Design a protein with these regions (language model features):
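ATP-dependent carboxylate/acyl-activation modules
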Residues: 1-189
Length: 189
């Protein structure tokens, strides 16, 4: 019912504490065209997770609108020696293969965020590329600075906060956080 309300095609993601990296357990299916496809995908995801992690708990499934753009990763955490920092780079499932990332200490300014983007080997993907319009860099920079501020405001409770992927739309379309993974510090720390 939720998929029909959002409008097809949709993305489906499994919700389980044992599936923090959903793609690694087959917990993401994109471009589902109708309700029957959503149901079949959910059943297949649950079966795959059960085969990989027999004690896994499936809390449900998340249905999301399909969005297009350039996939980025933004992450913030605290290093015990150097303090809080941000990592930004090309995201989605390619982040570990490409390792196209930049680092900065927090707090992050808009100029520092732009500098991080300028360091990326794949920065051309954020501009006009192969007939596609340029991406919304202003919105991406605002998201980077906002994530820096959010982490610093809540660092007493947050150990790590990762947005992957953050979809960067065309100019004027903004950015969309498709998956966010917070890691909270143990109580009493």
């Amino acid at each position: 019912a939720e998929a029909a309300r959002i409008g097809f095609p949709v993305a489906l993601k499994i919700v389980s504490p044992q599936a923090s990296h959903k793609t690694e357990v087959g917990g993401v299916t994109l471009g589902l065209a109708d309700e029957a496809a959503v149901i079949a995908a959910a059943e297949a995801m649950a079966a795959r997770l059960a085969a990989l992690e027999p004690d896994a708990v499936v809390e449900g499934f998340l249905v999301q609108e399909m969005v297009s753009g350039v996939e980025m990763i933004l992450g913030v955490r605290e290093d015990p020696q150097f303090g809080p920092f941000m990592v930004a780079g090309l995201g989605g499932v390619t982040v570990e293969a490409m390792r196209d990332i930049a680092f900065r200490m927090l707090p992050l300014t808009a100029g520092e965020a732009q500098g991080m983007l300028d360091e990326l080997r794949g920065k051309a993907l954020l501009g006009a590329f192969r007939g596609r319009p340029p991406r919304d860099i202003a919105a991406l920079i605002a998201a980077m600075v906002g994530l820096s501020d959010l982490f610093l405001d809540h660092r007493a409770h947050l150990a790590d906060l990762e947005v992957n992927p953050l979809i960067v739309g065309s100019v004027g379309e903004g950015v969309r956080a498709v998956d966010v993974r917070p890691v909270f510090k143990p109580a009493g720390n």
